[in-house]
Amino acid sequence: MISVGEIMERANHSLVRMRREGEDLTLEEKAEICSELELQQKYVDIASNIIGDLSSLPIAGKIAGTIAAAAMTATHVASGRLDIEQTLLGCSDLPFDQIKEVLENRFNEIDRKLDSHSAALEEITKLVEKSISVVEKTRKQMNKRFDEVMKSIQDAKVSPIISKINNFARYFDTEKERIRGLKLNDYILKLEEPNGILLHFKESRTPTDDSLQAPLFSIIEEGYAVPKSIDDELAFKVLYALLYGTQTYVSVMFFLLEQYSFLANHYYEKGYLEKYDEYFNSLNNVFLDFKSSLVGTGTSNNEGLLDRVLQVLMTVKNSEFLGLEKNGVDEMLNEKINLFNKIKEEIEGKQKMTLSETPENFAQISFDKDITTPIGDWRDGREVRYAVQYASETLFSKISHWSDPVSVREKACPTLRMPVDQTRRNVLVFRKFDSSKPQLVGEITPYLSNFIDIDRDLYNAASNPDSAVGFKEFTKLNYDGANIRATFDHGRTVFHAAAKSGNDKIMFGLTFLAKSTELNQPDKKGYTPIHVAADSGNAGIVNLLIQRGVSINSKTYHFLQTPLHLAAQRGFVTTFQRLMESPEININERDKDGFTPLHYAIRGGERILEAFLNQISIDVNAKSNTGLTPFHLAIIKNDWPVASTLLGSKKVDINAVDENNITALHYAAILGYLETTKQLINLKEINANVVSSPGLLSALHYAILYKHDDVASFLMRSSNVNVNLKALGGITPLHLAVIQGRKQILSLMFDIGVNIEQKTDEKYTPLHLAAMSKYPELIQILLDQGSNFEAKTNSGATPLHLATFKGKSQAALILLNNEVNWRDTDENGQMPIHGAAMTGLLDVAQAIISIDATVVDIEDKNSDTPLNLAAQNSHIDVIKYFIDQGADINTRNKKGLAPLLAFSKKGNLDMVKYLFDKNANVYIADNDGMNFFYYAVQNGHLNIVKYAMSEKDKFEWSNTDNNRRDECPNEECAISHFAVCDAVQFDRIEIVKYFVGTLGNFAICGPLHQAARYGHLDIVKYLVEEEFLSVDGSKTDTPLCYASENGHFTVVQYLVSNGAKVNHDCGNGMTAIDKAITKNHLQVVQFLAANGVDFRRKNSRGTTPFLTAVAENALHIAEYLIREKRQDININEQNVDKDTALHLAVYYKNLQMIKLLIKYGIDVTIRNAYDKTALDIAIDAKFSNIVEYLKTKSGKFRREYKSSYGERSLLQTNQISNFIDRKNIEHDHPLFINADNESSELFSKTASNIDVIGTLLLIDVLIRYFSKQGYISKESDSASDGITQAAALSITEKFEDVLNSLHNESAKEQVDLAEVHGKVYAALKSGRNSQIHQILCSSLNSISTLKPEDMEKLESVIMNSHSSVSLPEVTDSANEAYGETLHLFGESCLHSDGILTKKLM
């Protein structure tokens, strides 16, 4: 439970707005105030939830909303958030009133929506409801955030545009909610008002000034919603507003479609087809108009709003500077892109809402049937007319005009002849006699031209309440060919009609004509004929249908009600008995909300209830989904005879609790049912002290809470009621009686001896609560009873503290008149005088100071005096009174805040002048060094700035200010310096113009540099274009340096376009691009790169922009420079320490950067000034993952060996040469050794990857394997470890070259070359040279991603190796063995081991 202390703090600003004693607040006023603690929305949410929880509540009448509200209010109160919080704001009666109001509105809306839709409107209604739910869900989520966005946007250009969006959205939401709960007739009148809301919302898509479309397109066209950098806060806020406005725009369309659909359906049901046509036409026009605005017309120059917004979203999403995945913007953008694409797809997929063509009425009418009048509606002398409507799948046209009237003379049921529709649409036929309500009489399918108007008359005959007449007409019409399977009202057939009218003769005949499926045929709401019969009390029909084997437990679609539910709520005992005769019946079947037929029987009365209770299998205590039993409902309905009937079963649990642990007694107390409460209390088994969960509220608590004094008084007098029971938080009935101002209850409590010093868990006594309630008269009553006026809460507050801090003047004065201690302090060291100052209680402050003037300057623990607190809360009269009483005008609290600072910050010029006149210290500053002048500047109060500048005798801005010395460490800076800096930093352009333009302070603070630093383009433009300041400024570091470093792209663009030097020194040899790189501003880097940056320029550390990007871990910038500016940079360049980019990347443990550099071919062999390669550094630093990567991915094993062996390098000791000499291979050793160097001229770039030594060694391995010769001869057994290492290294390198020839990165990643090298070395060292071939083949075999073409290429490379090397001194036998080896290698490794075979399969 939230603490009272927290509530007091949160509620303070709301409380001071409350009216003084004696003035009652309206429900709306209370709701507004309480909403500041987010109570109002909570109540609305609860009210909305109940519609789902209790939508089938079997309680009828006007009290339905009240009962449901009471139930949900009980739930809310039980949540433990009651009590003190509501007491503070006087909101204790708001939940019940507001929930009741909201519920009544929601029930009205549901009643309207439960009306059926014509076939023409069903699909439209589904589309609208589906789309509204998608759009409104996210729009509501954005709503609260949009308020915050509105408040924070100060930009002069953007703010008015956003305000238009906000104003329209608020108006739309307000009007939508206002009409939502209207009753049907009022709802219709509101929608049909001339120049009303429908017209206004239709015009929202026009480019008029007060429309919604205009500001949305203005944002898009001006580019306000596209951020220029990640710090472009304004653009992100405008983007949010654009998205919110666009969703509102879509919501408006669907709202209009919903309303026009409703109106069309309403008049269709009424039979006013002309009005139906009018709104049906409006429906289509609205859709087509909005569709054009939203998705365009398909031409390139007519893009819709959704396309334009999606373009904005994609532009933002594709901005590389955003770093989207790191700041959560990406998720939001994707969500909106998906939403708008979904909406667009939905709208585009619907070409139109209606068929555009209105049918011509070509009907020729003739009476061919021998059916004489009178029959049904056919009476001689009446005039009959017909109208038609096209229907094609889910689209319908308007209804045609009525045909000329035809007089009825002796014959009925004419034949209508019409031309066949060429587009093969169905034709609906309507009929009207005289001026009566039209009826749908049938449907003509394609290819048919004749229609006999007889089926509707059959349906009407079955509906006739006069059974004899109905049966006679039905028999005649059926004999003459009427269709018993034709459907009419809401999908009902003659079976439903006979079931409703109770015409058992017709139903009996139909049961022989129909199939079993037709007897179970549901209408559009899921009602089968037996549902209709049970709901109408036609027991005979029910019995007949049961005998014919219909489904007895079938359920309706929405509420899932069985026929037994319907009979029970109607009280039809005989029908109930017939239903119970079925062996299949389930008497305890539940509906959607878990209510059983017995729950419904509560509404049906005592007789039906008795019939239920006589059933052995009945569950008397069955609970709904929310835990309500039938006994709960009987009490809620205040029907004691029904409750008594239940009790007569001797099975009822009278203490049963619902999901919130609320009993029937609780509900009686909540609803104020005194007589019912008496009956319950007198029951022997009653537990009067059951408490709700988790609120722990008893029935007595609820009776007091809802101000039912008679019920509360009765309960308190009852011996089995605990009057001292504590609810959550330690709240007793006595506390609630004070909270609610129940004097009668308090008097009774005093009479029965209740302890008046009862304390809540936070030690609030009744007197504490009275002191901060709206019932100050209770204070004297409690004091007269001896209440302790010096009692303290856990926070040390006395009743007087609470009265003053809650703005309760009358309560405070009553306590003061009783000589309470006015010098008591609470836990914050505050006295009542502090509270009076905070809440502006002048009369209380005067009363206290008249008693003790010394408290005027008393400080609390925060060093706040009463004067300072009054100033912080802008209570002018109190401030002036304190100053007149000698209060220290320059008082400062622990943060350094003083009265002058408070009013300067708020922009109150009159009070600033007043304090100047009272000789306040104008140079006083807070702990951050901020004086009144800085506050005025930072908050844009130009009037105060000008006033201060005019008071030369009191304030001089040229004075040195040491309070902010840390901001100006190298010199003594004046107030003027900080003021100009602040004006620029906080984007106060009018004040900048005053300082620079009017006063001529061009040099102070370097305004152009500061404007560039903070990205204020308007100020930059003003200074350059109107004050003619140089774009390069007068300092060493230029404005461009500042703008680039801080990523202000638009400012960078502007400065460069106006001649700023992109290579100007920014200090330490750095230029603008270096500054941008250090902060990872890719977009700025790209722009500067395109405008003449010198990429070879080095800073004082010898670092180029490229090396800076690597050092700063700016991965995307580094890749951009390598990929796009390769001609301007040297990937292998070195700084003053001879470090390359790879060295730097290793230093910073940036594996991603290392991979990037390796990918683009950086030389891994380069050594820095300390003779270290990048791999050496990684090994020394023990960066194991980097070491592993460099070993396996760099592919330079010879260099690895050299690094490992230092001065014993193979190249230095010439051991490779010695090794090859022993093989009798002649070569130009130095050239071979240098073949890996960039400076080598021996090989072209294409051939430079071929290591001749490695090739020879690999071939030698293969030759000796297949010729069964030893690899190392006996003479070489003593060969040094270095020679063996060299051989293994070269073989592995050549093997890597073979793999590289595939250009298959995945294949290379699957081979661990370090492992290959180790195995080859081990084999050579141990003399197991035959294993080398197996090692290499095994490595190839481990590659899972090799494709057949890769294998063929691999084989080709191996087989072509002979031609790539020269063996001048090799013997013929060796050459022959070499050729045979290549063949055997292909056969044994690529084929025999199955590698190639497997890959080709």
UniProtKB/Swiss-Prot annotation:
Q: Which UniProt keywords apply?
A: ANK repeat, Cleavage on pair of basic residues, Disulfide bond, Exocytosis, G-protein coupled receptor impairing toxin, Membrane, Neurotoxin, Presynaptic neurotoxin, Repeat, Secreted, Signal, Target cell membrane, Target membrane, Toxin, Transmembrane
- In residue numbers, the region (Furin-like endopeptidase recognition region) covers 17-20, 1196-1199
**Residues excised as propeptide:** 1200-1401
Biotechnological exploitation: Is an essentiel tool for stimulating exocytosis and study its mechanisms. Its mutant LTXN4C, which is unable to insert into membranes and form pores, plays a key role in understanding the dual mode of action of the wild-type toxin. May be used to antagonize botulinum neurotoxin poisoning and attenuate the neuromuscular paralysis via synapse remodeling.
Locations listed in the record:
Secreted; Target cell membrane
Disulfide connectivity for this sequence is 413-1066
Tissue expression profile of the protein: Expressed in venom gland, cephalothorax, and abdomen tissues from both males and females.
- Residue ranges of the region described as Helix H8 is the probable transmembrane region of the tetrameric pore inserted in the target cell membrane: 238-257
How is the protein altered post-translationally, as described in the entry? Processed by furin-like proteases at both the N- and C-termini.
PANTHER family for the chain: ANKYRIN REPEAT AND PROTEIN KINASE DOMAIN-CONTAINING PROTEIN, ANKYRIN REPEAT-CONTAINING PROTEIN-RELATED
Question: What exactly does this protein do?
Answer: Presynaptic neurotoxin that causes massive release of neurotransmitters from vertebrate (but not invertebrate) nerve terminals and endocrine cells via a complex mechanism involving activation of receptor(s) and toxin insertion into the plasma membrane with subsequent pore formation. Binds to neurexin-1-alpha (NRXN1) in a calcium dependent manner, adhesion G protein-coupled receptor L1 (ADGRL1, also termed latrophilin-1 and calcium-independent receptor of latrotoxin (CIRL)), and receptor-type tyrosine-protein phosphatase S (PTPRS), also termed PTP sigma.
Domain remark text: The H8 helix is predicted to insert into membranes and form pores by assembling into tetramers. The helix is contained within a helical bundle domain that undergoes significant conformational changes during pore formation to allow exposure of the H8 transmembrane helix and transition of the toxin from a soluble monomer to a transmembrane tetramer.
What name has this protein been given in UniProt?
Answer: Alpha-latrotoxin-Lt1a
